[in-house]
Amino acid sequence: MVNLLLAVIYVAFISLGLPDAVLGAAWPTMSVDLGAPISWAGGISMTISAGTIVSALLSDRMTLRFGAGKVTAVSVALTALALFGFSVAPNYWVLILLAIPYGLGAGGVDAALNNYVAIHYESRHMSWLHAMWGIGALTGPYIMGFALGAGQGWSWGYRYISILQVVLTAILIFSLPLWKKRSEVKTGEVSGESDGTANDETRKPLGVRGVLAIRGAKEILVMFFCYCALEQTAMLWASSYMALGKGIDKTTAAMWASLFCIGITVGRLASGFLTMKFNDPAMIRLGQALVLTGICLLYTSDAA
């Protein structure tokens, strides 16, 4: 049962990643259909991010009250509804409104599952969990590319992904008893575990000030801010850059944009093994070196 729940959590993170790179992949086509400037994709992305931030800040309190399973199921359902709304949106401003529930749902899933896995599973599962996100993120543009290539338009690309989210919502609802059983097993274990994790059901919610008071938290937040800026910029603008800057066919550009997510997925899968040999600072330096190499190659292609 424990392995079954872990499989459900992995699938949930695949689902979380599915729509993340789709906006960037589809925007060269969407902007024409909606009569919106290319730069306006940033407004949708920022609205989604704002919803994610709000949801993540409330996640700890909501998870302690309702449980990670219920929070995840409701969040995925909210995301599914928002994505279906994307598929029928008549104009740009409706997309902005729908980006709010989309961001709230995505943030709820992300924070709840990260917290749950950190508490109930070994640390290596965190690397695999985020690799699952990468699988979803690289699959999304291919789904959108398929819809565009078949002449169905970007709306059907979003519709396909919303259907997958609905299926996952049903899976999560049926799996709710597994979440409870896992929590009961964790609660019943000996209190003197090596990781020293406190019972998640008895602690009080940790506010923003409490989090910032943790040693190293501020530095980690700054570092993660920089990482997210890099990740979101590449996912949002890679397809537009190739289609508008390099003259690549829009359908091909949508599919090629997923190569960035393939790199993320492979990197996260490999990191689970590399951490057995290298410490955290070495892993961070290795990642920065690879990023710098990629940026240099990008400028090399411009020069060519």
Where do the model's predicted regions map?
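Extracytoplasmic gate region of multi-pass secondary transporters
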Residues: 23-24, 216-258
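Symmetry-related core transmembrane helices of the 12-TM Major Facilitator Superfamily/SLC fold
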Residues: 158-174
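Conserved small/polar residues in nucleotide/adenosyl-binding loops
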Residues: 299-304
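Residue-level signature of mid-helix packing/kink "hotspots" within the transmembrane helices
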Residues: 49-53, 57, 138, 264-265, ...
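Conserved MFS/SLC helix-loop-helix module at the cytosolic interface between two early adjacent transmembrane helices
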Residues: 56-79, 83-84
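Helix-breaking motifs and short loop linkers at transmembrane-helix boundaries and internal kinks
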Residues: 35, 67, 88-90, 247
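C-terminal ends and interior cores of transmembrane alpha-helices
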Residues: 78-90, 291-298
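Cytoplasmic helix-loop-helix junction between adjacent transmembrane helices
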Residues: 100-130
